[in-house]
């Protein structure tokens, strides 16, 4: 097949996206496909139309962050009639907006940490924030990925610094209750839950951008240290979160697990990193899959769903389903 890979873009996750795109390009070429990498610019709609006219069969999205995994590119590809891997426009948009996804989780009875939206026009004092959510507090931008803009506030000074950081990458910021315990991530491929990974930061127990990307910033446990019952609860919560947002293909669910092994869903990433050292390929490797085999499974899954969509009377993707 002729495959166009979208990688790079303008988000804060540009460099990770480029590494993902190049790794996937090599894997797709190893599978016998012709792969072409495009770094999206303002003329992307025209460029994709031209690629379609030139015989493009499939688009592989390796973008991260706003403009890549928020449903914009997915909607564009739907309109052009070009198949692609991963979730559709609606699920992508819902998952990208952490505030909206948390509201859905709460409505569906999926445990997620308590939060409050920061209102710059009516700012709360540190004492008021702590009274509602406890201390420390997690400061988060509503729509960013790769832990960009996330920080842990332990006092009034670090709260102000965290708010400034989060506001630099998102117009909406919220504070979230910090759940002491374990950081667990679940990779899910079309309903199949891959082995859970426990993430242990080298410094403290908060998984931020530095812990994620700095050499030696964290270590991973596979299998994780949860009991069989705790792992089952974690997998059930992660799968429910995946389904209620209407995710398709590969997605990653990030959770905290407290001292009683109760899971708390933090967010869902519909276009997780796909570098050879990323979490999803690491989980797949625990099943004996190579990176190329994971890419092949993702591609075949997407092609099967595209065929079903074309044959459906409405020609549309499925909507999010109650868990």
Swiss-Prot record:
GO terms for biological process: cell wall organization; peptidoglycan biosynthetic process; regulation of cell shape. InterPro entries: ATP-grasp (IPR011761), ATP_grasp_subdomain_1 (IPR013815), D-Ala_lig_Van_CS (IPR000291), D_ala_D_ala (IPR005905), Dala_Dala_lig_C (IPR011095), Dala_Dala_lig_N (IPR011127), PreATP-grasp_dom_sf (IPR016185). Its main location: cytoplasm. Pathway: Cell wall biogenesis; peptidoglycan biosynthesis. Its cofactor is Mg(2+); Mn(2+). Pfam families: Dala_Dala_lig_C, Dala_Dala_lig_N. ATP binds at residues 130-185. Mg(2+) 1 binds at residues 254, 267. Mg(2+) 2 binds at residues 267, 269. Residues 102-300 form the ATP-grasp domain. The keyword Membrane does not apply. SUPFAM superfamilies: Glutathione synthetase ATP-binding domain-like, PreATP-grasp domain. It is an enzyme of class 6 (ligase). Keywords: ATP-binding, Cell shape, Cell wall biogenesis/degradation, Cytoplasm, Ligase, Magnesium, Manganese, Metal-binding, Nucleotide-binding, Peptidoglycan synthesis. GO terms for molecular function: ATP binding; D-alanine-D-alanine ligase activity; metal ion binding. Its EC number is 6.3.2.4. GO terms for cellular component: cytoplasm. It is found in: Cytoplasm. Binds 2 magnesium or manganese ions per subunit. It catalyses: 2 D-alanine + ATP = D-alanyl-D-alanine + ADP + phosphate + H(+). Belongs to the D-alanine--D-alanine ligase family. NCBIfam families: D_ala_D_alaTIGR, PRK01372.1. Cell wall formation. This is D-alanine--D-alanine ligase. It comes from Synechococcus sp. (strain JA-3-3Ab). The lineage of its organism: Bacteria, Bacillati, Cyanobacteriota, Cyanophyceae, Synechococcales. The gene is ddl.
